[in-house]
Amino acid sequence: LVAWGGGSAIENAAKYVGPGFQLISFDPKVSMSIVGREAFESEETLREVAELAALDATIFNQDACLAARHICVEGDDEQVDRFCALLHERLGVDRDFAEAFGPKPDAEIRDAVEGMRFLEPEYRVWGTFDGSGLVVRSPEMVDFHPTNKTVNVIPVAAMREAASYATVATQTVGVYP
């Protein structure tokens, strides 16, 4: 039996292991998105890209491994912050596969994000812990697993830099343009 996922998924799969079966488990898969500088060509384009990124991030309230947890954005701090603000607005929307208010972030995320609020301007946070969505801009990937509509945005000077954030655990990469 081969299973991918976090602790609860592996525990559930282990129930089916019996004589003649062996459990082979793999870490959860993580998806990301990459947004190119072209997103900033107009306000309309930026809003469209923020909507697309929100769609990528909120599938099944981010429970699906194909939901983006990290988004690398090519741009300067002002541009990336504008994207983050628009993304935050779009996370809290009812969708076919996501609710406006999903599960609230767990204590690990809350504690880490509260600490990051004191580290501006290097880190910046949009949103609260009410389940409507949270965006964290940081100079590198955060050291917690973003879930429950929590998105980590990482500014990059060039799109090729985003490749360094992909690992063996990366499942899907959304790309704009």
Q: Where do the PLM segments sit?
A:
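NAD(P)-dependent aldehyde/semialdehyde dehydrogenase
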Residues: 60-174
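Conserved NAD(P)+-binding/catalytic subdomain of aldehyde/semialdehyde dehydrogenases
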Residues: 1-70, 75
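Short secondary-structure boundary segments
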Residues: 177
